[in-house]
Amino acid sequence: MIRLYNTKTLQIEEFKPIHEGHVDMYVCGPTVYNYAHIGNARPMIVFDVLKRLFEAEGYSVTYVSNFTDVDDKIIKKAAEENTTEAVIAQRYIDAYQEVRTLLNTELPDITPRVTETMDKIIEFIDKLVKTGHAYEANGDVYFSVESVPTYGEISHQHLDQLEAGARIETNDQKKNPYDFALWKKTDMGIKWNSPWGEGRPGWHTECVVMINDNIGDCIDIHGGGMDLKFPHHENEAAQQEAMHGNTLANYWVHNAMVNIDGQKMSKSLGNTMWAKDVVLSLGTNLTRWLVSSVHYRKELNFSDETIETARKELDKVLTPLKQAYIKAALANYVMGDDYDKESYRAFLDCLDDDMNTPNAYAIIFETVKKLNQTLRQREIDFAQVALYRNAVEKMLNVLGIVVDKPVIGETEKELFAKWNQAKADKDFDSADKYRNELVEKGLL
């Protein structure tokens, strides 16, 4: 039984899908005007692990994540580079997908773009205007938050508790300071014709329409970073309530932010860490291990200390797996697919509890300890070795961490034999030579 913390209810709830055995999940994607930073990478990993968990528990998953390829920042960059918005957007979409691949994430099944959904966005806004939930003002269109009594249910703030200017745009055209733009009149950059004149859509409408268009009127899980809870997800939910009279998602799941050396990552501090640079520097496995080492609802700190701690932890896990594989191969023992089901089940139970990765890591360490104890026996029970090793590999697979299996052919077996014989003969020069060759092959 999978249980998730629902931001909307402030409770950890049993997951009950709309369609039995299937999960529909939408995660807000990037506005593509720059490269992905490590803060963008966290939800990539968090929701990839969640998807893998559902699949491990027997669910099928439809995973949708959008690209916002229309935005003032994209238009500004296109003007600065004397090119089109489409060129800018495609550059950063390609870069974003590259990071997803480098992180070994399972790519979303559907990646809709705003520009490909424009007709339906305009139709959606027009219906909101005609039903009295939105109004036109000098070519702009605003959503009336007072028209939806449930406004504030995602961020748990009532209108009278909100502070004007807190991540919202204020102007004299609005009937209420918290009314938000559905359509923006413009004569600059890319624009589309609409019943209200030329313009482009507001950010908050795009995701609702893409969810309705690609999945349906209600989805199982809507995910994203905690910074999207208000106003973005709040405004999405309000539009859905106004249009269809129902909740947009049954479970709202948000990951916490990423800090750098204990400080918030920001341009002003100059401490932005680009995701591609991090992965190329640390490697896929270490990056994923570090990100998942902290519960997704707690802030994650990137520092030399946390990186080194994660490196040591991961080495303690992967090294015994490699040793087990090599020793079995040298003993001509072929490991099957069977695994320690009790340990693997305990691991999944931890993740089923609101993706409690720290507790899941404890199960990994416990199983690795059993593996090490078995490997130290005078007469190694390779059947038991295989059970523990395969269980840990399955656990790591759910976390998106790849376990390499070294090639152990006759050449490698002969090299091990020469190394062992040289040590037995106390021929240390030869032993060092053979050992170095084994190290170069990644076998030691």
Residue ranges of each PLM-predicted region?
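Short catalytic-loop micro-motif centered on adjacent basic/acidic residues
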Residues: 63-64, 108-112, 222-224, 382
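N-terminal, positively charged nucleic-acid-binding surface of large information/translation enzymes
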Residues: 9-14, 18-106
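Alpha-helix C-terminal capping/helix-coil junction sites
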Residues: 55, 129-130, 253, 431, ...
